[in-house]
Amino acid sequence: DDTLSGFRLARLEVFNWGTFDSRVWTLQLDGKNGLLTGDIGSGKSTLVDAITTLLVPANRIAYNKAAGADSKERTLRSYVLGHYKSERNEVTGAAKPVSLRDPNSYSVILGVFHNAGYDQTVTLAQVFWMKDTQGQPARFFLGAERGLSIASDFAHFGSDIAQLRKKLRGLGAELHDSFPPYAAWFRRRFGIE
């Protein structure tokens, strides 16, 4: 069936991304259209931003654009730490974000794309962690020519990101430390020139 050819998002998973905290949250699309609805602040833009992060280089991303927000309102750091409100210091008057997670946690966003016309599956993922208390998170990029999931493939590695990398390589995944080789990898698989 030619209507099913081409890669389509089959499943989106997020772990410790924005306010999606402490467990794997899954959006199962199976290559079909989906509709994100909900109240203001319910996470619609957060999920769109996860997909954008998987596919677009960091220097081209404007987070929370779907909600029409100020470009400084959300950052990769705010998503990884789970900033959900600001508290004002009564002495200085300065606002400080309040986080769901401490800097010792890690975050994963994962998309499984399937081309039913050719029976091909590709998983793209990014893993984030804080190397220091300031600045943006560290990350690595993953591509695999099969379906992976956060619960089974990105867990049970202790707290050492190097062990997670080793585990994922053992599953046949390609790991990259920057966006350009990762993008080249997925563009080849998706047939994007």
Please name every model-derived segment:
Residues 1-193:
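Extreme N-terminal "head/tail" segments of very large remodeling/mechanoenzyme assemblies
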